[in-house]
Amino acid sequence: MDNRPIGFLDSGVGGLTVVRELMRQLPHEEVIYIGDSARAPYGPRPAEQIRDYTWQLVNFLLTKDVKMIVIACNTATAVVWEEIKEKLDIPVLGVILPGASAAIKSTHSGKIGVIGTPMTVTSDIYRKKIEALSPEMEVSSLACPKFVPLVESNELTSSVTKKVVYETLLPLAGKVDTLVLGCTHYPLLRSIIQNVMGPDVKLIDSGAECVRDISVLLNYFEINRSREEQTLRHRFYTTASAKSFAEIAEHWLGQKVSVEHIDL
């Protein structure tokens, strides 16, 4: 047993989609979350800058004595997950491999779409992971640079958002039967994305898939939180407005949250 919290990091609010799934599947675990909304989105930034920013978030979480770190950001996972995993002596999870595996299990046609930030798409990491597991798959990737700013602005259902999503995803419509939401912000736009892609296209939430791996590692390392320890104190930190973060977090998680602004 290990009653320390699990640390989550993201470029902003997107990683809350992973936290929500964790709270559903593993409700007895405690969360510490840091979202770098002041510097979001990470996707258009150079790899070295993404690496530096991600390490800042990791080091912040380490000061909170977390027992595991979840890089709840596809861009950061693509750039620096391997390095962080090798250097830390606690488990470190990324969100890409779970999403890739789930897409392979889901598809019937072998035609998989991947949407993500420019960095995630340019890295080609989803195609590499999918084809390594199942070489016969046909992967089509599409960068969606406007999606993260819309989510960070809490523009989740506006007419502008619907128009942007429609125009962006049109090249993939009718060409895939499975679509990986290769950015943890994108599930916040899930209903609009589903409407554009059509009801027969299966959407894969890479972050939600990651929670299954969290559960496996908690059991493997025997670091589950004691179920007798009832007091949970989830803590959320943001580099931008605590008020704006709380509005999105409370809407998405369905509960009041404690949010503190920090400067890195």
Curated annotation (Swiss-Prot):
Its EC number is 5.1.1.3. SUPFAM superfamilies: Aspartate/glutamate racemase (SSF53681). The keyword Isomerase applies. It catalyses: L-glutamate = D-glutamate. The active site is at 73 (proton donor/acceptor), 183 (proton donor/acceptor). Pathway: Cell wall biogenesis; peptidoglycan biosynthesis. GO terms for molecular function: glutamate racemase activity. GO terms for biological process: cell wall organization; peptidoglycan biosynthetic process; regulation of cell shape. Transmembrane segments: none annotated. Substrate binds at residues 10-11, 42-43, 74-75, 184-185. It comes from the Bacteria. InterPro entries: Asp/Glu/hydantoin_racemase (IPR015942), Asp/Glu_race (IPR001920), Asp/Glu_racemase_AS_1 (IPR018187), Asp/Glu_racemase_AS_2 (IPR033134), Glu_race (IPR004391). Keywords: Cell shape, Cell wall biogenesis/degradation, Isomerase, Peptidoglycan synthesis. Provides the (R)-glutamate required for cell wall biosynthesis. Belongs to the aspartate/glutamate racemases family. This is Glutamate racemase.
